[in-house]
């Protein structure tokens, strides 16, 4: 499934760093261990960063993920006032530029702040608790409900 691109492995660190590995060298080692494993076992290199619940991010996270070759980084936890402002302005997706003084353009990375931390947006939460109805896209089906 991974090789057929039916399943995407994201982040692929040994653990979700920043709370577990706050030192830059440890962040690098954490990602190296995970990426080496994924490359050996699946023959792929992850392209997406995913950090749903570390307690804070340093500016180095964006830099590290960009230098790892990630196309994007998805995360949930950020300053409550920053999140409110970005939500009001419909700006939860942006290009993060951690530093260009010494690093150049390669450190830019697309970032997406998750809508409501662990929850999917209304209508897209298909777990056992919320049980939103799935989309039936066949127009001939009695239960058709796609937008």
Predicted regions mapped to residue ranges:
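Catalytic-domain carbohydrate-binding cleft regions of carbohydrate-active enzymes
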Residues: 1-147
């Amino acid at each position: 499934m991974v090789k057929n691109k039916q399943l995407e492995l994201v982040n692929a660190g040994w653990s979700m760093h920043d709370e577990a590995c706050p030192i830059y060298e440890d962040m690098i080692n954490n990602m190296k261990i995970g990426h080496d494993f994924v490359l050996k076992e699946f023959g792929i290199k992850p392209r997406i960063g995913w950090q749903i619940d570390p307690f804070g991010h340093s500016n180095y996270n964006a830099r590290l993920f960009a230098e790892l070759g990630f196309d994007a980084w998805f995360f949930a936890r950020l300053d409550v006032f920053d999140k409110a402002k970005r939500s009001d302005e419909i700006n939860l997706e942006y290009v993060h530029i951690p530093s260009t003084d010494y690093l150049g353009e390669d450190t830019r990375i697309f970032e997406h702040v998750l809508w409501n931390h662990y929850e999917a947006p209304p209508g897209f939460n298909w777990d056992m608790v919320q049980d939103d109805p799935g989309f039936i896209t066949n127009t001939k089906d009695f239960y058709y409900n796609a937008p």
